[in-house]
Structures are given as C-alpha cells and as structure tokens.
Amino acid sequence: MTDQQRALNYMNYLAVDELLSLQRPVSDGPEHDELLFITIHQVYELWFKQLLHEIEQAQREMDAVRTQDVLATLNRVKVILAVCIRQVDVLVTMTPLQFNTFRDRLESASGFQSAQFRELEAVLGRRDHRFAAHLLPEHRAKVEARVSAPSLWDSALAYLNACEFSIPEEILDRDVAQPYKHDDRVTAAVLEVYRSGHQAALVCEQLVDIEVSLRE
C-alpha cells in the first residue's frame, strides 16, 4: 500500500466500509424491512453514545462552573434528543405486518436490552439497580457504575451551590446511588435562581427542556 493510499481520508477516518458491514440481517432472503430495523437501532446506539459523551462533558463544565460552556453542551444534548425522537417517524413507516415478517428471527432480542440506554437513564437520575440485572456482566458493570456516580441533577445541584445559591449540605453529600428525594429547600433555591436573573437560570431552563424531551 502506498503512502497516498494510507493517507487519512473520509472513508478510512470514519471506517465506512466496516460501518456498512455491521448491518447483518438474520432473516432468509433477507426481508426487505429488516435492514431499516437494524439501521435505526444502530443509529440510536450511536446517539446514546454521543449523549453519554456530552452529558459527561456538561458535568465537568458544571464542576468547573463554566456556565456558557454548560449552556452550549446542554443545548447539544437537547438537539440530539430531538433527533432521536424524530427518528421514530422513520421507524413507524414499517407496519406491524412488515415487522412480523422477521420478528420471530430476533428470538429474545429487545430494545430493553440496550445497555447504553440503561446507562443514559442512570446518568439522567434513575436509580434502580434491578434494571441492569438482565444484562451481560460487562454491560451490567457499566450501568451499575453510572448508578453509583453523580447524575446530571447531582452535578447541577453542586453547580448551583457553587454559584452561591444555597443547597443543603446533606443533599450535596447524599448517597448518589440512592434515588433523589424532593426537598422544599432545593425548590426554594431554584426559585431564587430564577428571581436573581443569574445565568444559572438559563442552565435550569435547559435542564427543564431536556426533561420535557425525555417525556415525549
């Protein structure tokens, strides 16, 4: 192979040939719609990976009280979530009858087995050690590590406290592996953020927008 052939280009930088080889239908034929099914779910997994990457970045920026960076990163999270939601529009072009032409070949495979989705749930605050029980050990370990680490909300509370909006110490020091429990003092602190006109209010708005997106 010549140096020119080895030079970085679009195809080898993105590993396009390898990427396009990863859609592997299991149905005989194969069934036409199975490729769409595989592609959509693989794309979801890529977006889950990116969301985890961005949320980790937002948490680092919150720790450093870099408000403008936090806003930019949370906005990206929000936009990616919107893309994930719109992607459903493509999936629903497949009718139940079309799906049933290959569903039996999938055996027990299910979207509920997505380890990255469980990681995403954990980093966004879900605290349930049972939801990783059915995963393979290596995937279960990753989910359990997320459950035991500060969630995005935990990072946000520490950020608000660093911005001099008083968050009770026992909440900042709580066991983050346990579910967050509503506290009126935190609500009061968030209301004070909004009343103050501080840019932290924009961060709170981004977090609300993300929560709304997750409910769609």
Regions from the PLM with identified roles:
Residues 1-216:
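Surface-exposed peri-terminal alpha-helical interaction modules
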